[in-house]
């Protein structure tokens, strides 16, 4: 038994050391309708305080416990069900309630009651949330902010039970995204009107940047995502200009990634700062992992013959869980999961392309005199 343990230990140490010298690959686990997901277009992802993963799709809200899905859909016969199955955004408030944005209003899931209720509050301006919800997020004061198509921005203060509506009709009522920076400034991304900011909770709103040659930064652009970076900066995604970095200290804007390898514009849909030096970029053409230190990037795409690749190239949502695993929502492929890499093992498996393994059943392997590793499978021999 002792000798067996030593052999196994040496074996794993050897494999581990060799793996460190192998170029890193990214292996994803897919969850889709085949695994119980209600629908394959994942628009929104959230991990709640209990650890459940929530996935919002075009046909239902899903709660994943690591083994199976529980699906929530509109049921006209059940008054406790959600009132709309087309999910667009998710947010957990300070009380652990899940705010669910849909293509026609907002619903709140109360875990203790396991029931949904429509957020049918009337604002001081005599308006209600009736249209498609672009985004829901909270601020440090516990207020909930809701961007709604053609209705501008809503802000709900639960302590005062007060809802305010800011139509922003002088700019555009179509807010695509927003965020609060570390200093409390609210940044707004519009559909067709670029980037704006407010330092006084929307009492006044200003376009970002001083016009140069008659045009300001992001003017006329479709801003799809704004996130706070680690170095007092914002990362801004757009439809035609890829990803830009806005330095909040100097006010300077620089483009990080605008065109792909073929010279086409990058359509950015989501951004996720994974670490101090790594920015994940979800696009219509896969994922770019951008190194903020070296300005180099890795482009990940779906592959028909690679079962560990992304399941789809149209990436709609990126989310990092508390274990630092990444959840990737796509348009056709459901959700892909990439766990944190504590140790790295390279995988060799059939891909139906040149220089890949032939056959899944490895019967024997040995090292040749020239250092090549020979593997014998049930179908062929590889080296």
Language-model segments: which ranges?
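A short, hydrophobic C-terminal helix/tail in secreted or cell-surface proteins
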Residues: 379-383
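Carboxylate-rich, polar loop motifs that coordinate divalent cations or form catalytic acidic clusters
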Residues: 1-378
